[in-house]
Structure formats: C-alpha cells, structure tokens
Curated annotation (Swiss-Prot):
Signal peptide: none annotated. SUPFAM superfamilies: Nucleic acid-binding proteins. The keyword Repeat does not apply. One of its GO terms (molecular function) is DNA binding. Residues 26-89 bind DNA. Residues 114-146, 166-206 are annotated as: Disordered. Keywords: DNA damage, DNA repair, DNA-binding, Nucleus. This is SOSS complex subunit B2. It comes from Bos taurus. The keyword Protein biosynthesis does not apply.
Amino acid sequence: MNGVRDPPLFIKDIKPGLKNLNVVFIVLEIGRVTKTKDGHEVRSCKVADKTGSITISVWDEIGGLIQPGDIIRLTRGYASMWKGCLTLYTGRGGELQKIGEFCMVYSELPNFSEPNPDYRGQQNKGAHNEQKNNSMNNSNNVGTGTFGPMGNGVQTGAEARGCQFSYAGRSNGRGPINPQLPGTANNQTVMTTISNGRDPRRAFKR
C-alpha cells in the first residue's frame, strides 16, 4: 500500500489485495467495451511501465477518454483477481490523471495479468465477492478522471486533440501504427473519403 504522496509503485510490485495504490503507466491498448447488467460500460486497458504490463478495468465515461499513448497517474487504486488474472481498479475515490503522452520507457513483458498459479488460492477466496462487488456496487470502480487543462497550461485530453490523429500504438510489437481519429472508439471504422477532383454527382446522371 502506498499513499498519494508516495513515489509511484512499479507494476512488478503490485499484488492482489493491495489498496491505495499510486501507479504511473502508459496506455498500450484499449479493450472492447462490455456492459454490466445495470448498463455501465467497462473497458479493460493494457497498461505498462518499465517493469512490465498489467490490465486495468476502467468504467463508464473515463474509459471513453483514455487513448493509447496516454501517460496516466492512478491514485487510490487497488489490485484484485478477476477471472484468474491480476487486475487494477480505480477504486472508490480513486483517480486517473493524464500527465503526458508517448514519452515513457515501458516493457510489455512480463504481463502480470496473465494467469499465475501463485494467485489461485487468493482467487478462489475472493473471486465470488469480487464479482458480486463489481456488478452490485460499481461505485468502487468508477473513480474520477482528469483529462482537462493541466497546471502548466498545456491542454490534454480529448478537447486538445482537435483534428490531429491520436496515437494508436502497436498491439503486438509487429504491426504498424494505425492512426485513429479523435472521438472514435476502437471498434468503430473510420471512413475516409478520397476525391479525384471530379464531382461525384456527375457520375450518377443518366
């Protein structure tokens, strides 16, 4: 457990059951959106620092603001097992604050959210309660997010992206970097119109 003013905890040091976590990471991937029975949107995001990667579960509007390449500070988060995998949560009163973009040393390996036999005992003890808490009391996971102007006057977040492409990252280290238009979800297709200078209406005249 570390406090808000303590140095950030490395991902490699995160264990199930830890609370009040202060972690700084870069967002690598945004998972697809799933919906709970009571209508809340949940995204599982792959994040990393120089010691490895982990999955963080982000709820509702905040998840829609996060983009790959964002450098984020999590405060007052907690770690728990979910379906056999170590997962970070914002927690009640937790906060996600964007502090930069792109420039951070990170390593995708090891992935600490991969199933780990050492955590099976803790999973069996806490999985049922964790699932119940996730579905019944989403306030534990919602938290807050800061994606507006920073203290130094630099605009961050969706409102600062304008018409520029946002960073889409490399999903597996082998693929190309795919530009993504701001405000589009990962599961949406961005249509691009290519014009040859002719009026397209003329082609349909009989």
